[in-house]
Amino acid sequence: MSELAVGKKAPSFTGINTQGVKRKLSELVGEKGLVLYFYPKDNTPGCTTEACDFRDNYENLKKLGFNVVGVSRDDEKSHKKFTEKQNLNFELISDVSGEICEKYGVWQEKVFMGKKSMGIVRTTFLIDSSLKILKIYPKVSVKGHVMQIMKDIEELSK
């Protein structure tokens, strides 16, 4: 994997969405860009809070020209249940193999309650319409994250 950095091209990928349809990165980008966020697991407290925050601000992000897509290693059946339960209005991409997570460098060793394990480190990438990375948000804290993204999009648009 090449080093991901602001100004570099976002790694291309093809993933399966909630409806079982193959979607390419290039098909997911909005008029001005994409908010691509990686999260550990469907229907867990932090991931639900984050997804609902994106859901509640989706129209505002669309007005700014950005689409939202979430990626985790859950399968499409899990994503479908999560989408229905939380009434999500954006696509989730299933990365069961972990290939997309590896390309974006978010599959890492984590420590929880003293135990080490591999997992997705909550990370968001702001990508422009030409698929260049505008901003990387590593080790995301859920609270206030979506508001920060919208603020950053507005700043970058000036």
Which residues does each PLM region occupy?
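Chalcogenol-based redox active-site neighborhoods
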Residues: 1-158
